[in-house]
A protein has these predicted regions:
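Long, non-globular targeting/processing and low-complexity regions
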Residues: 1-128
């Protein structure tokens, strides 16, 4: 017996932070996107604003990483590392705060750029 698509489609499992689909259940493309999610775990709508999709995926994981992280890069103090992580987290929060509108103050733009530069610089240190 075949399961109803809503029972096998990750979008409708009510599990947070695993599906970033931008379609509504009533969207006429939803059957196609549902099939994509079942086949590969995401649908094409997640690429409409990949910036937001990536931010929404990384942000809660980075916040949790900071909470449970058991190490610090050798050249940094714990405070320095936490300050770097905070700046990266703030940049991601600001980047995805308006769901793609990209309306930031000059100060917010500076914070985003600083945090993303730090993310690039310290990306390989995000492990423990």
């Amino acid at each position: 017996m075949e399961q109803h698509p809503l029972l096998t489609d990750i979008k409708y499992l009510n599990v947070p932070n695993i599906c970033f689909s931008l379609t509504e259940e009533t969207d006429n493309r939803e059957p196609i996107y549902s099939e994509q999610r079942q086949l590969r775990g995401f649908d094409d709508s997640e690429t409409w604003s990949l910036t937001d999709t990536i931010c929404l995926f990384i942000l809660p994981r980075l916040q949790r990483f900071k909470e449970i992280n058991a190490s610090t890069p050798a050249q940094l103090t714990e405070k320095e590392w936490n300050d770097i992580l905070d700046k990266i987290i703030i940049s991601l929060q600001l980047t995805c705060k308006d769901r793609g509108l990209r309306i930031w103050t000059e100060e917010e733009s500076k914070q985003i750029n600083e945090g993303l530069d730090l993310f690039r610089e310290w990306f390989m240190a995000l492990w423990w």
